[in-house]
Amino acid sequence: MPSDLASYLADHYLTADPKPSKKRKRKHGDSKKIKEGAGLLIQDDDDDAAWTKPSSRDADADELSAAATIAGTSAEFRRATKSSWKTLGGGGSSKTNTDHEAAAADAILASAAAESAAARDAEDDAPVVEGASVAAVKMSDGTHAGLQTAATVAAQLQRRRAEEKAQYERERAERRAARGGGGDSSGEEETVFRDATGRRIDVTLQREQKRKAEAEKQRAAKEALKGEVQIEEARRRREKLEDAALMPLARGKDDEEMNNAMKSEQRWNDPMMQFMSENDKREAGGTAKTGGRRVKGRPVYKGPAAPNRYGIRPGYRWDGVDRGIGFEAERFKALNRRERTKDLEYNWQMDE
């Protein structure tokens, strides 16, 4: 019985101590205790004491504090002022009241969240997400309007270039498919050029003509650097190559062309050369003096050599060193000096 009485009193008459007020200095234990879920007030004997009664200053502070308090007072105070009925039932009413308060709080939170979402939708203050379905304002170069970072602008420009390239490839493929060219690059459209009269200009033909003219100019410049002998030899080689196309594959001893070519070739050690006359040599295709060779066909020195009074050329094995005493050179100097003096004397006589 005592345990049941203690639990009954705790459930129906005892409440937790409220938090102390910062503006009123009271004792930690209030004289009045409000039972949760009931309207009965328990008053101590010392409540009538003067030191426990609040002063006018404390009352004003309480009014200001109540005015500054956010809407909604404690459940204990509302129940204490609205109802003074005493509940005689068990402790199930406390749990029911707590459930009702939790449901009311959840309803308030849900309504506040709904109002906040509606306000965001109405004021359009939702954050902008890159790549979202909301279309952002873009400029002509493909970048978004407004303040952007360098990396964002570079990525937007790269994306714009990729889109333009893909669009160009699609249009190019469509044009090829329309012309029936497939993937052949030769089906590309060419730029048409026209003159002042409207006549079409064949750019390919003009380029070919310019290329040929340039090649002809270069060939003429190379030909100008060659001598007559080189030009003649080149002509003979071309003729020989042209004749080789009609030449039979097998050539024997009766081939006149080959026999004439072998007879016309001159050799310095040919013993028959000294018995041939000038006419025979010319008929054979040679000359009296060809390539620094004498009529007899013996080799001679082809380099420069000092003149002598007999007109004898040095041997073909001479190394170019003059090993004489210099008489021939002094002789020619004396002859030249005498001729020059003679000319000067004649000119002086004419002046007088």
Swiss-Prot record:
GO biological process: mRNA splicing, via spliceosome
Region (Disordered) residue spans: 12-100, 157-199, 206-225, 281-314
Stretches with biased composition (Basic residues): 21-30
Residues passing through the membrane, by range: none
Keywords on record: Coiled coil, Cytoplasm, mRNA processing, mRNA splicing, Nucleus, Spliceosome
GO MF terms, alphabetically ordered: RNA binding
Subcellular location(s) of the protein: Cytoplasm; Nucleus
InterPro entries referenced in this protein's UniProt entry, alphabetically: Bud13, CWC26_splicing_factor
PANTHER family from the UniProt entry: BUD13 HOMOLOG (PTHR31809:SF0)
Quaternary data: Associated with the spliceosome.
Job of this protein: Involved in pre-mRNA splicing.
Protein name from the UniProt record: Pre-mRNA-splicing factor CWC26
